[in-house]
Amino acid sequence: MNKAQPPLQNATIRYQSLGLGLLALVLFIVGNWHQAIIGFDSRFVLFAQEMLRHGPSFFPTTYGQPYADYLATSTLLTWLLSVPLGQVNSFTAWLPTAVASAFIVILVFRLTAPYSPRWGVLSIAMLLLSSTFISETRAVSLDQMLAAVALAVFYLGYAHDHFGAAKRLHWLFPLLILGFAIRGPIGLVIPTGVLCSYYLINRQWRQLFSFGLLALALLGACVGLLLLLAKLSGGEVFMQDVIRMQFLGRMDGTEGSSGVLYYFTSSMGNYALAYPVALLVLLAIAAGGRRTPDPALKLVLYCAAAGLLVMLGLSVPQAKKARYILPMLPMAAIIAAYPFQVTQGRLFAWLRGLMLGIWTLLPTLLIIGLVAARKRYPAELESLGAMFALLGVLQVLALLALAKARLRAFGPALAAVLAIWATYIVVVEPLERSLYDTRTFSVAVKTRILQQPAPVVLHGLGKDAKAIKFMVNFDCDKVPLFTQSPAELALIQAPAWLVMSQADFESLTEPRLRSITPTLTGAFDKNPYVLLHLEKMSSP
């Protein structure tokens, strides 16, 4: 055993990590109560709304039918939080992800603080400054939940060998089951691969093969249960949909396709600051030559192996999205903060200076960015005086902290974290919700339809695309009709309410439809949309 600290200090670290986790949770949920639902969140909120009306199920539902791409685990969490309120809102939808993100903060600190509390705190800072972590934390993110599971599995394996936590290994397989329940097969494979990479680098062959084989057997059992539940929920056809969407579709590119190096190149921006700085740290370690690694450096190498495995493993399927490799981010953050753990080496000193410079200047850089953004969105960003004042105060505090040796590392990092999160919560989120608003138009449409009930036809919205963004604001069991072509639309019988884009309306040639004056016009997901009332002709 290589205990990094005596048990008493480990107890102190546990309390400190819980405190940091609670502070992070407050940051993650501040200002989030009844935000408008936009983008990818619409799908999961619609799942929860239907579950709130009809009760729990194995798979989430849309339009009353089971949805094949996910199990209902995350929807169940939102449902449980929404039941006392009687409604689903942004707070109940986001809270499970926020808790998972806070759990990641706790584990990152517990991994690194036994070597140096400064390393632990600055690893958290690098995590909180990473762009995809920020956007996914304040959203419904199954991949963020999976990142928490994967890091927990890695932590249990590492703590067993280094922190004397042998009794906790029995949690490994329940965590793998939880990962599968959240994210399907990939939710079990990624945490398994992360721990297997640790055993491989550590040359623990017996643990590698025993854990790997048991995880493989567990994967087979979970897949069998998944297909059984699919057959019970929707029959043979639905089971085939589950196989296509959760297995084959991601592998063969039918769900989207990107290049093999997509994750390695796009992460330079999507996972800045942690990922690009982590690459520089690894280059500095390699340039330092071969030497016997101390426990802290070994942790860095274990994290590098785990992060690399996640990126390589997820590069195999054709379908790739930036959020899929979130389990890599905590590892990258730990590596990126490593220069503050070592005291020797010119390259590490240069990296410390680089990071301190970025942290210190970030409030000013954000002010410059907001000035540029206001030129593009003058109406939405006209009132930025308070934000500029806050960033100015944080800039002054960062400079003052930089001048004091005791605060030199922590002060600028804290100022940078507060600056970027304040900017995101106060400026970026409202701007996104203004530009991509779907609630205003949808609620206005619902009001008109309730005044004169008739079938609703969604033309050109896509049953699993913009229609979801419309129905999440409708929040009722009314199942609309869907049309994609003008020929299908021409078959619709009056009376009916027609929802379509302004462009689709102007391209109609059917005289019966083209002559209708729009009842309502408004912005929907950054595009002009219209509501038409197709009235039944009165008999002569």
Tell me what each language-model feature is.
Residues 107, 126, 146-162, 332-335:
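Specific aromatic-rich, kink-prone transmembrane helix
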Residues 95-115:
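Transmembrane-helix motifs of polytopic, lipid-linked glycan transferases
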Residues 33-50, 56-59, 65-77, 87-91, ...:
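Extracytoplasmic catalytic/substrate-binding loops of multi-pass membrane glycan-assembly enzymes
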Residues 1-28, 214-218:
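Start-transfer (signal-anchor) and selected internal transmembrane alpha helices
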Residues 113-118, 153-169, 340-343:
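Membrane-interface transmembrane helices that cradle and orient dolichyl/undecaprenyl
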Residues 90, 94, 135-146:
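Short acidic/glycine- and proline-prone juxtamembrane loop motifs at membrane-interface regions
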Residues 44-50, 174-175, 182, 187-321, ...:
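Transmembrane-lumen/periplasm boundary regions of multi-pass, lipid-linked membrane glycan transferases
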